[in-house]
């Protein structure tokens, strides 16, 4: 399973760890992804999404029905 948010598209990014001596070693910054089920009232079923916490806030704001419609318009299977 890839580490990509289905709602926002957030992916891992790369950067550096910096020690006290300013030595740089490469590292990855991973998005805060959660597996979550949402109830779709119109379809009378649950949908499982792998979303970031930012994606959860977007769903709280817009509503799951609107977000799922946007995902389907993008061609993503939900």
UniProtKB/Swiss-Prot annotation:
Q: Which GO terms describe its molecular function?
A: structural constituent of ribosome
Ribosomal protein: present as a keyword of the record?
Answer: yes
Q: Does the keyword Ribosomal protein apply?
A: yes
Which biological process terms from the Gene Ontology are attached to this UniProt entry?
translation
Q: Name one GO cellular component term.
A: cytosolic large ribosomal subunit
Which Pfam families does the UniProt entry name for this protein?
A: Ribosomal_L28
Segments for region (Disordered): 1-21
Instruction: Give the source's domain of life in one word.
Output: Bacteria
SUPFAM superfamilies attached here? L28p-like
| Keyword terms | Ribonucleoprotein, Ribosomal protein
Report the NCBIfam families cross-referenced here: L28
Q: Which family does it belong to?
A: Belongs to the bacterial ribosomal protein bL28 family.
Q: Provide the protein name.
A: Large ribosomal subunit protein bL28
**Name of the gene encoding the protein in the UniProt record:** rpmB
């Amino acid at each position: 399973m890839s580490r990509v948010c289905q709602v926002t598209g957030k992916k891992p990014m790369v950067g550096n760890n910096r020690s006290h001596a300013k030595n740089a070693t490469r590292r990855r910054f991973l998005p805060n992804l959660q597996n979550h089920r949402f109830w779709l009232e119109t379809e009378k079923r649950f949908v499982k999404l792998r979303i970031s916490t930012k994606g959860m806030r977007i769903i709280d704001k817009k509503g799951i029905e609107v977000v799922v419609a946007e995902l389907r318009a993008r061609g993503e299977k939900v």
